[in-house]
């Protein structure tokens, strides 16, 4: 079953998408994944994310164990476990770059092994939307289905990214077409596991004015050695940004089969604690970060209590500063502790 929701417009060339409350089935299945299809002027809401049973699981290396299944270590008061409530909102705008909408997001919750999970992601496609579309529908399922996710999330996420990319290259796109990814899994409002490839970014903001970027911008001028070690090169034309083999403005991405030998899909991963004064987790595509710094983003929304309003305010500010690209933003707000 599918639903469509008509959207109001900020101006004719924009597509604005406001926050939608998610539903969760008794079994914990993800419901109502947000999908804005290329060429459409409306939001299509899918009832359920399909699971891909054809992804081949491979082992691409080892990481030290970092157990995130820590129910036994939760803070206790009077013998009861304490957890942190959290909520989310999001906003998307189609840019003015002469192509269809290529940004896709996930903003959802589900329960797994007794944990309340927040699943948040930005997928910023390039040379088409097919890869970003596929990632929105499959990547979280592939991550959470890894048998060692709770015991060794870094190893599990790297394996899921790699196996998903292998499937994409074989079945979804040819030599052109790819996507960034920033995925964040919030666990009981206490801990967050963040992974990324490309230049979509995530930051954590605390009321003490501490703003921490928890992703890495995979830009060619910062990873020249990586590209060179794979047999590629980084070049820059006057007035343009550095590019891998003169083509791609990032060193890590899903897809991009024609450049795969010279780029990587292995993500940077960080596991962070949510502090008592942590207020927001913010994920956004580079349409926002090109015109606003991390500190400017925090300054704009620090007084906001509503995540949806915060996400819309940030995109409105980016538009006012002249951003022409697709812009997507997910804001997670951390609320009171509960037991």
Swiss-Prot record:
Mn(2+) 2 binds at residues 124, 286, 325. Binds 2 magnesium or manganese ions per subunit. Keywords: Hydrolase, Magnesium, Manganese, Metal-binding, Protein phosphatase. Gene3D superfamilies: PPM-type phosphatase domain (3.60.40.10). PROSITE patterns: PPM_2. Its EC number is 3.1.3.16. The keyword Endoplasmic reticulum does not apply. Mn(2+) 1 binds at residues 124-125. Residues 87-334 form the PPM-type phosphatase domain. Its cofactor is Mg(2+); Mn(2+). GO terms for molecular function: metal ion binding; protein serine/threonine phosphatase activity. Disulfide bonds: none annotated. It catalyses: O-phospho-L-seryl-[protein] + H2O = L-seryl-[protein] + phosphate; O-phospho-L-threonyl-[protein] + H2O = L-threonyl-[protein] + phosphate. It holds the Pfam family PP2C. The keyword Glycosyltransferase does not apply. PANTHER family: PROTEIN PHOSPHATASE. Belongs to the PP2C family. This is Probable protein phosphatase 2C 28.
């Amino acid at each position: 079953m599918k639903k469509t929701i008509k959207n109001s417009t900020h101006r004719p060339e924009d597509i604005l998408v406001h926050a939608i409350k998610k539903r969760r089935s008794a079994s914990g299945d993800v419901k109502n994944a947000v999908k804005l299809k290329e060429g459409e002027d409306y939001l299509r809401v899918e009832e359920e994310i399909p699971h891909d049973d054809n992804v081949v699981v491979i082992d691409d290396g080892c990481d030290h164990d970092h157990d995130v299944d820590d129910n036994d270590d939760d803070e206790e008061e009077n013998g009861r476990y304490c957890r942190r409530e959290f909520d989310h909102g999001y906003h998307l705008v189609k840019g003015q770059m002469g192509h269809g909408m290529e940004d896709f997001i996930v903003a959802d919750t589900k329960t797994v092994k007794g944990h309340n999970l927040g699943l948040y992601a930005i997928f910023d496609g390039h040379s088409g939307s097919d890869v970003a579309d596929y990632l929105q529908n499959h990547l979280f399922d592939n991550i959470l289905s890894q048998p060692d996710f709770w015991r060794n999330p870094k190893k599990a996420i790297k394996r899921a990214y790699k196996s998903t990319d292998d499937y994409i290259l074989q079945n979804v796109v040819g030599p052109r077409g790819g996507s960034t990814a920033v995925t964040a899994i919030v666990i009981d409002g206490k801990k967050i596991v963040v992974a990324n490839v490309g230049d979509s970014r995530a930051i954590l903001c605390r009321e003490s004015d501490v703003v921490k970027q928890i992703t890495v911008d995979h830009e060619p001028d910062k990873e020249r050695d990586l590209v060179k070690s794979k047999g590629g090169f980084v070049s820059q034309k006057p007035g343009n940004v550095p590019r891998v083999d003169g083509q791609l403005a990032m060193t890590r991405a899903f897809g991009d089969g024609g450049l795969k030998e010279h780029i990587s899909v292995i993500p940077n991963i960080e596991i962070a604690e949510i502090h008592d004064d942590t207020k927001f987790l913010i994920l956004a595509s580079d349409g926002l970060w090109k015109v606003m710094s991390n500190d400017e983003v925090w300054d704009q929304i620090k007084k906001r209590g509503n995540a949806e309003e915060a996400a819309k305010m940030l995109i409105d500010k980016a538009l006012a500063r002249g951003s022409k690209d697709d812009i997507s933003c997910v804001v997670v707000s951390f609320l009171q502790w509960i037991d």
